[in-house]
């Protein structure tokens, strides 16, 4: 439609698990992983499970612990389920509707697919119009639904879901890290530039895990194997139990992951592209101290993502590090709240100054970045 406008939803979290041994409660594992990824999106969340090829799920607006009550999580628990996907979503105001929550489940003539997406397509409006002209009916306003339609259309025309995904990648522009679950396969997909992170882990009893960040692997007891390469399709096949890679779109020279992942988005205990997020932020603080040395009495950081850089600044400069703010742990990340008014109201109760640390002192205040200046 002519007045359609896509919201930005760069910071989402995706997760997928294939339990080869059949010993995991995959719904509970997805819940734990989404809890670990909650910092990446607080608008909505969802989990889908695969019970011998039958995919069912639940998604809604709200935080993970709000949406997945014991009763809801219990309804997804199934000893025969061997795969699960999960998603936490961030989006700006105007798109806070349940239809945009993920995983999106699509049922078609060749089976069922559940899809989770982190990223933002730059040609989504064009692709949506093309699909609408072909008769597609959209239920939400997200570019994720566009990806679902394209893969489904190609799946009906082609032999395998892997071929359908590869064909879809030919027309997608922008950022996308996907976790896709079919009847017998769990698939991870990363765009050829590698804008958004996506990693692979292994389960102790056999099986594989895909996630936006390695902290989600830790939450389910998985071991980090490697990152999904830019442009790579990684398939965990339940029929063979094997992991295989499709590299038709790998090799683009201009790969470039969003720097904000290391600066702000990711949790400091995550490992991305082989580097510790915590150490990367500390190193940024050290560089800042080298480039902008000052005389001061104390270095403080803005919780939470500014603390690591502040520690690095202190270590490099020799200026003592202090706790200058106390953060209310029940207030989420103000950057990913929908309106500026919401952000301003939240920050008043989010942070409180520790006066004994800063009163009468020369203070170096370190934050990870300035987006809106709200903090």
Model-derived features: positions:
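Hydrophobic transmembrane alpha-helix bundles
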Residues: 81-86, 184, 214, 218-219, ...
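Active-site lining segments that contact anionic ligands and/or coordinate catalytic metals
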Residues: 175-176, 195, 205, 230-231, ...
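Secondary-structure transition/capping motifs at alpha-helix termini
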Residues: 136, 157-158, 293-297, 315-322, ...
């Amino acid at each position: 439609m002519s007045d359609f406008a896509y919201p930005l939803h760069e910071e989402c979290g995706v997760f997928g698990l294939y339990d080869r041994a059949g010993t995991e409660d995959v719904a509970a594992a997805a819940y734990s992983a989404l809890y670990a990824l909650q910092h990446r999106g607080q608008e909505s969340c969802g989990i889908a499970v695969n019970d011998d090829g039958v995919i069912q799920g639940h998604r809604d607006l709200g935080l993970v612990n709000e949406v997945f009550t014991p009763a809801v999580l219990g309804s997804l628990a199934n000893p025969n389920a061997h795969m699960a996907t999960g998603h936490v979503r961030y989006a700006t105001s105007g798109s806070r509707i349940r239809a945009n929550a993920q995983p999106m489940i699509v049922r078609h003539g060749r089976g069922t697919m559940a899809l989770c997406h982190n990223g933002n397509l730059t040609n989504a409006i064009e692709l949506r119009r093309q699909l609408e002209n072909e008769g597609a009916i959209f239920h939400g306003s997200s570019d994720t639904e566009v990806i679902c339609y394209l893969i489904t259309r190609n799946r009906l025309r082609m032999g395998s879901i892997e071929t359908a995904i590869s064909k879809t990648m030919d027309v997608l522009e922008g950022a996308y890290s996907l976790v896709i679950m079919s009847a017998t396969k769990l698939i991870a997909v990363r765009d050829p530039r590698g804008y958004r992170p996506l990693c692979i882990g292994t389960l102790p009893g056999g099986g594989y895990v895909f996630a936006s960040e390695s902290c989600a692997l830790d939450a389910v007891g998985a071991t980090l194997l490697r990152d999904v390469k830019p442009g790579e399709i990684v398939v965990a096949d339940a029929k063979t139990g094997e992991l295989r890679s499709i590299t038709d779109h790998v090799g683009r020279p201009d790969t470039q992951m969003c720097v904000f992942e290391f600066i702000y988005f990711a949790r400091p205990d995550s490992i991305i592209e082989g580097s510790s997020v915590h150490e990367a932020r500390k190193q940024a603080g050290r560089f800042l101290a080298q480039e902008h040395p000052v005389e001061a009495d104390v270095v403080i950081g803005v919780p939470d993502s500014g603390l690591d850089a502040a520690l690095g600044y202190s270590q490099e400069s020799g200026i003592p590090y202090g706790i200058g703010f106390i953060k209310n742990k029940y207030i989420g990340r103000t950057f990913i709240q929908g309106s500026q008014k919401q952000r301003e109201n939240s920050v008043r109760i989010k942070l409180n100054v520790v006066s004994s640390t800063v009163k009468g002192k020369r203070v170096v205040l370190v934050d990870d970045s300035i987006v809106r200046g709200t903090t």
